[in-house]
């Protein structure tokens, strides 16, 4: 396999054609609306369940005495997220903090998959399960990141209408920044673009950073001899720990900020 083939192989998703419910050939297929990236969906669900299992286990075993190391770690994460929500969200909703915690930990776990050896799970998938392709970093799939951003967008609309009413939401889109009926078309364009840019930028920012990080690991593995890969892999992996944490934090912060803006007057 040439370096070009190796890189291309690792950038292919395991895809299911929803019209025939059969796996597609990643080398002779163009993705369509009816194509589902089942590897991204699988790892997203598994990591979500892992998050729920970890926090449920800690909640059941939590004691008022001296906590264990894992409980202390989880409490630090909860305290950090709670402090962030308290500083940035000025509404009264009780679901924002749990939502922010879910977003932060879930996105972090997705990003963390990028630190696994690049050939480990694809090799297992190919030689044990006969899978034609496998990508293990859900946040490097634009479909996953934009889907999560779409969920945030729906919440933005929900909280805007809940806090301001339908009339207030429509007025915000049509009467600002120019408070005159003659400027309604201009206001609608400006506010509409501003509103739609939030989920698009939120999803593409996470995707772009994680895709680039994954691609660098693939390039190192595909272009260098195996005995010299560690020279670049180790420093990049150490630096990437910061990237995956920072991207999870940014996604959480922007989610909180957008929902806070939706809950307030313009």
Curated annotation (Swiss-Prot):
Localization per record: Cell inner membrane
Family listed: Belongs to the ATPase A chain family.
PROSITE patterns hit by this protein: ATPASE_A
Mode of membrane association: Multi-pass membrane protein
Name of one Pfam family that matches: ATP-synt_A
Organism: Klebsiella pneumoniae subsp. pneumoniae (strain ATCC 700721 / MGH 78578)
Any single Gene Ontology cellular-component annotation: proton-transporting ATP synthase complex
Organism lineage: Bacteria, Pseudomonadati, Pseudomonadota, Gammaproteobacteria, Enterobacterales
NCBIfam families xrefs: ATP_synt_6_or_A, PRK05815.1-1
Transmembrane segments: 33-53, 95-115, 141-161, 206-226, 237-257
GO terms, molecular function: proton-transporting ATP synthase activity, rotational mechanism
Record note on quaternary structure: F-type ATPases have 2 components, CF(1) - the catalytic core - and CF(0) - the membrane proton channel. CF(1) has five subunits: alpha(3), beta(3), gamma(1), delta(1), epsilon(1). CF(0) has three main subunits: a(1), b(2) and c(9-12). The alpha and beta chains form an alternating ring which encloses part of the gamma chain. CF(1) is attached to CF(0) by a central stalk formed by the gamma and epsilon chains, while a peripheral stalk is formed by the delta and b chains.
Gene3D superfamilies registered for this protein in UniProt: ATP synthase, F0 complex, subunit A
Keywords, alphabetical: ATP synthesis, Cell inner membrane, Cell membrane, CF(0), Hydrogen ion transport, Ion transport, Membrane, Transmembrane, Transmembrane helix, Transport
Primary location class: membrane
Protein's recorded name: ATP synthase subunit a
GO biological process, one term: proton motive force-driven plasma membrane ATP synthesis
Function: Key component of the proton channel; it plays a direct role in the translocation of protons across the membrane.
């Amino acid at each position: 396999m040439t370096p070009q083939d190796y890189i291309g192989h690792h950038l292919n998703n395991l895809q299911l054609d929803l019209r025939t419910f059969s796996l597609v050939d990643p080398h002779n297929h163009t993705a369509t609306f009816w194509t589902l990236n089942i590897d991204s969906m699988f790892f997203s669900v598994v990591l979500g369940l892992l998050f729920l299992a970890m926090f449920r286990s800690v909640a059941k075993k939590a004691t008022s005495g001296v906590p264990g190391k894992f409980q202390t770690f989880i409490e630090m994460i909860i305290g950090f997220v709670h402090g962030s929500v308290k500083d940035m969200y000025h509404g009264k909703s009780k679901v924002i903090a749990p939502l922010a915690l879910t977003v932060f930990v879930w996105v972090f776990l997705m990003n963390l998959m990028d630190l696994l050896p690049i050939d480990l799970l694809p090799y297992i998938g190919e030689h044990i399960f006969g899978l034609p392709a496998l990508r293990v970093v859900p946040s490097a799939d634009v479909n996953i990141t934009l889907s999560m951003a779409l969920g945030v967008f729906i919440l933005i609309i929900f909280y805007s209408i809940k806090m301001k009413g339908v009339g207030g939401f429509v007025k915000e889109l049509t009467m600002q920044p120019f408070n005159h009926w003659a400027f309604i078309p201009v206001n609608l364009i400006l506010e509409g673009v501003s509103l739609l840019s939030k989920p698009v930028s939120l999803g593409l920012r996470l995707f772009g950073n994680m895709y680039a990080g994954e691609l660098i690991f693939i390039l190192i593995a595909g272009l260098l001899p195996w005995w010299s890969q560690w020279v670049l892999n180790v420093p990049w992996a150490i630096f990437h720990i910061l990237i995956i944490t920072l991207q999870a934090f940014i996604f959480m912060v922007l989610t909180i900020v957008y929902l806070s803006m939706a809950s307030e007057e313009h």
